[in-house]
Design a protein with these regions (language model features):
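Extracytoplasmic/periplasmic copper-protein system
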Residues: 30-51, 139-156
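Extracytoplasmic
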Residues: 1-42, 147
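Surface-exposed acidic, glycine-flexible loop patches that form ligand/cofactor-binding
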Residues: 187-194, 226-230
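Short, solvent-exposed loop/turn and secondary-structure capping segments
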Residues: 27-29, 85-87, 114-118, 127-129, ...
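Cap/lid segment of the alpha/beta-hydrolase catalytic domain
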Residues: 162, 168-176, 199-255
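Alpha-glucan (starch/glycogen) binding determinants
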Residues: 16-18, 74, 80-143
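N-terminal cap/lid segment of alpha/beta-hydrolase-fold proteins
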Residues: 63-77, 90, 94-97, 105-106, ...
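Extracellular ectodomain segments of secreted/surface proteins
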Residues: 43-75
Length: 255
């Protein structure tokens, strides 16, 4: 059966059919037959959301709305099933006629979250997101920003900024070279004779030495604390807690 829609429509609408028979006419509402212009739906999402700050430059998705719901979009025309694994919950994505898969999550708590795309059973990183070491592997991440109360971990104008340095050292315990990340306060280069206290800051489970400076913004936290007088200038050393036992991922040791 074919019909022509003469009036332009936007959004989702019910389709009604009138069947003429010997005993009169009947009106049926096939409420599962819905149509929409997919480009209009995408545009509607963009109007009420903003790009996640953890996106690669130029990527429009993932996006976040005012309720902290995340919107994911992924192009995979040959895939048969895709899910987003975020915050311990798997969301089934829906495929459109152009091969784009989309989904909206439940509201997320503010802060940083790891997530994965599960494409036909294979867990992969989202090419639209920067990757971070977490969950014992390289993973995609999405940052749900706080409001004004989150300024303590954001870089501020007029605040002297320190540095995070990647340092290589030889471990006598492991008999191998290792890497650690070291924060130095803004005054460090101009006070070469000053001795500073040292804070050794460990990451969470499944992360590594980059966690606090990359996902945790510790350098901005330290800069702001020092500038406000709430903290004395100090060095912060961040090393990997993976000393003896290897990380395990999905029940198997990493190879």
């Amino acid at each position: 059966m074919k019909t022509t829609v003469k009036t332009p429509v936007k959004g989702i609408h019910d389709v009604y059919f009138v069947f003429k028979g010997r005993k009169g006419c009947k009106l049926f509402n096939f409420d599962w037959w819905k149509f929409y212009r997919e480009d209009m739906m995408v545009q509607d999402v963009r109007n009420v959301t903003q790009v996640a700050p953890t996106n690669i430059s130029g990527c429009e998705y993932p996006r976040l709305d005012a309720e902290h719901c995340a919107y994911f979009r992924f192009y995979a025309p040959q895939a048969s099933k895709i899910q987003v694994d975020c915050c311990g919950k798997k969301y089934d994505m829906q495929k459109d006629t152009d091969g784009f898969w989309t989904v909206k999550t439940d509201p997320l708590v503010v802060g940083f979250h790891y997530y994965f795309l599960i494409v036909d059973g294979v867990s992969v990183a989202d090419p639209s997101s920067y990757t971070f070491f977490g969950c014992c592997r390289m993973a995609s991440g999405i940052e749900v920003p706080e409001g004004k109360e989150g300024d303590y971990y954001r870089p501020q104008q007029g605040v002297p900024h320190g540095q995070v340095r990647s340092c290589t050292y030889y471990s006598e315990t492991k008999k191998e070279f290792r890497r650690c990340m070291v924060y130095t306060p803004a005054e460090y280069e101009t006070n070469v004779k000053k001795r500073y206290p040292v804070l050794y800051l460990q990451h969470g489970m499944g992360e590594d030495e980059t966690g606090w400076s990359t996902q945790g913004y510790m350098q901005h936290i330290m800069d702001n604390l020092i500038a406000s007088g709430q903290c004395v200038p100090m060095l912060v050393v961040m090393d990997s807690g993976d000393v003896e036992a290897p990380f395990f991922s999905f029940g198997k040791a990493r190879i």
